[in-house]
Curated annotation (Swiss-Prot):
Organism of provenance: Methanosphaera stadtmanae (strain ATCC 43021 / DSM 3091 / JCM 11832 / MCB-3)
Name of the protein in question: Phosphomethylpyrimidine synthase 1
Disulfide bridge map: none
Entry EC number(s): 4.1.99.17
Residues annotated to bind [4Fe-4S] cluster: 408, 411, 415
Length: 429
């Protein structure tokens, strides 16, 4: 049975107990949230993934994407990126490999980590199709579903599937005033397949079969936003909302079948529309966990899109988003390297912290309180311990010497906290 089915039967699983303990939440409250579809625990029955809860009343989680491309493929490089994202606190990882060695890379990632692993199966189906000297849109239904079955058996915990890309959705794009059309790689591949074959999307037409596969292995569905806006001009348009309403119906079918499900959200959204997008999604999709890419709140900062995404993600998380997909400085420019991965994870961790302050998560509030106390006490070691990136904080602090170890080089003798404390001490004497 799936975690959702156990929860609905009133049974508390070891996975629920683990999540409740790590989140410091009542396990019965957690069970009810899982039973209602507001929380998922992406954990395939075939692996030893650490149970990680995503959704209502829990810490905001972050995902980091790695993986090869047809232009750059090196297993060791991808594993080095994995080490970095684990070091800086990613809660999940997605392997988005599209190169010939994608099987080897996924297995290496699975063998090296126990955090939830996600994929986009249609990438592998496309690679398999082109390896047979066919064009990618000639992939048949069997390859798509065979790929999903094989990945489920291998222990993939959650899969992004673009079930909302339908013939009607493509018409909505044609009827819209979009500047950039379809920018999701999986969404574009699916749309091209539909147009080439003049048939409905197999993942939509055979959704019940997809649910059977996921139910057998307790693979969590992540319903992809194939029509997400690729620029702020296209945000919250009819095509995006048309797909979202389809996903809302699919959420209900998934939950009815006992399959865990979350929904992916928009990519580029002006800051004035972020909160509304979260509210629309939560309403249409029955409060299923929301997994957002950013959203990026401006289009003119290439090289700094980890910052534009963190701004949007902070608002999104504070407004109800549950799962943040990191964005690196390399977004829109190149395949990310190790430093890009580091910067992307840290930026997303900051956004998650900001989100959890808004959600008043008790352990987050305690961490913020403890940091204030440490600063007031000039307890530098404690500050480094509590910091999201204590390594960098320590490096900056130690980069310059001061006459008094309590002070940093910014203010020196003009340190506001020390000045008041010294006068208070003198007055007492």
């Amino acid at each position: 049975m799936t975690q959702l089915e156990y929860a609905r039967k009133g049974e508390i699983t070891p996975e629920m107990e683990y999540v409740a303990k790590t989140e410091n939440i009542d396990v019965e409250k957690l069970r009810k949230n899982i039973a209602s579809g507001k929380v998922v625990i992406p954990k395939n029955v075939h692996n030893n993934t650490l149970p990680t809860g995503i959704g209502k009343d829990l810490h905001t989680k972050i995902n980091a994407n790695i993986g090869s491309s047809t232009e750059m493929e090196d297993i060791n490089v991808e594993l080095e990126k994995l080490d970095i994202l684990l070091k800086y606190g990613a809660d999940a990882v997605m392997d988005l490999s599209t190169g010939p060695k994608l099987h080897e890379i996924r297995k290496a990632i699975r063998d090296k980590t126990n955090i939830p692993l996600g994929t986009v199966p249609i990438y592998e189906a496309g690679v398999e199709t082109t390896s047979q000297d066919k064009i990618i849109v000639d992939m048949d239904d069997d390859i798509i579903f065979k790929t999903i079955i094989n990945q489920a058996k291998e222990g993939v915990d959650f899969i992004t599937v673009h079930c909302g890309i339908t013939q009607d959705a493509i018409k909505a794009v044609d009827d819209s005033e979009r500047l950039m059309g379809i920018v999701s790689r999986g969404g574009a591949l699916t749309a091209a397949w539909i147009m080439h074959n003049e048939r409905e999307n197999p993942l939509y037409a055979e959704y019940d079969y997809l649910l059977e596969i996921c139910k057998e292995h307790d693979v969590t569905l992540s319903l992809g936003d194939g029509l997400r806006p690729g620029c702020i001009h296209d945000a919250t348009d009819i095509a995006q909302i048309r797909e979202l309403t389809t996903l809302g119906r699919l959420v209900k079918r998934s939950q009815k079948a006992g399959v865990q499900v979350m929904v992916e959200g928009p990519g580029h959204v002006p800051i004035t529309q972020v909160k509304a997008n979260m509210q629309i999604q939560k309403t249409i999709c029955s409060d299923a966990p929301f997994y957002v890419l950013g959203p990026l709140v401006t289009d003119v900062a290439p090289g700094y899109d980890h910052i534009t995404a963190a701004i949007g993600a902070s608002i999104a998380g504070a407004s109800g988003a549950d799962f943040l997909c990191y964005v690196t400085p390399a977004e829109h420019l190149c395949i990310p390297n190790k430093e890009h991965v580091k910067q992307g994870v840290i930026a997303s961790k900051i956004a998650a912290e900001v989100s959890d302050i808004a959600k008043q998560i008790p352990s987050t509030m305690k961490r913020e309180y403890d940091m204030a106390v440490a600063r007031d006490n000039f307890d530098w070691e404690k500050q480094f311990e509590l910091a999201i990136d204590g390594e960098t904080a320590r490096k900056y602090y130690e980069s310059t010497s001061t006459s008094d170890e309590e002070m940093c080089s910014m203010c020196g003798d003009f340190c506001a906290i020390k000045m008041v404390k010294d006068h208070e001490k003198a007055n007492k004497n």
